[in-house]
Amino acid sequence: MPAKTPIYLKAANNKKGKKFKLRDILSPDMISPPLGDFRHTIHIGKEGQHDVFGDISFLQGNYELLPGNQEKAHSGQFPGHNDFFRANSTSDSMFTETPSPVLKNAISLPTIGGSQALMLPLLSPVTFHSKQESFGRPKLPRLSCEPVMEEKVQEQSSLLENGAVHQGDTSWGSSGSGSQSSQGRDSHSSSLSEQSSDWPADDMFEHPASCELVKSKTKSEESFSDLTGSLLSLQLDLGPSLLDEVLNVMDKNK
């Protein structure tokens, strides 16, 4: 039986000119049973793309069918079907006109359509933007280490030059032949070059680099602790516990 068909509870032989009251027409059978978890998940208002939320993938990309978008579709101003619209009554750019009263209770519901039907809305990109900047690429520890490295290189070069000159002077003073002095100078310079090549290169960079890496590590740990602290700073106060009252009663009885 259609729902619009009225059900008359009283006899039809009523007095002429007397109309049926609403309570005489309605019956408990017309009241539907509970629908369970029924929610208003899709809404398309008269304003078109400015008054819509929920899963509108049933349009299959034909967004020009929305009210108020026919002229934009013909002029080519209507955006593509992958654009993500979010109904928010607080934004002035999206709602220049009077928004629908339904949207006041649907701020967190996104407009989903097409390939974005399984995507979740972004969570406060403004607040996380500054946090993500702190996790950028770590700078190389070069500023505080360059003077130390240059000093060590200068010391090694000066040692090599002084050793070669000193050996050359002693060889010229002690020996009378130029061949012996040249051989002594070459042998001494080769021995110094071998010693300098045997020096570990890690000694030049170990201590300054380690201290700078420790600083960068502490900075990253501090930024990460700030982020986790802001995310985990939610505390719920559920009021006094019932266990405290029970313990107080037990103490009084003792």
Swiss-Prot record:
Domain of life: Eukaryota
List of residues that carry Phosphoserine: 89, 108, 144
Pfam hit, one: PBD
Subcellular location: Endomembrane system; Cytoplasm, Cytoskeleton
GO BP annotations, alphabetical order: regulation of cell shape
Protein family per UniProt: Belongs to the BORG/CEP family.
Purpose: Probably involved in the organization of the actin cytoskeleton. May act downstream of CDC42 to induce actin filament assembly leading to cell shape changes. Induces pseudopodia formation in fibroblasts.
Name the UniProt record assigns to this protein: Cdc42 effector protein 3
The encoding gene: Cdc42ep3
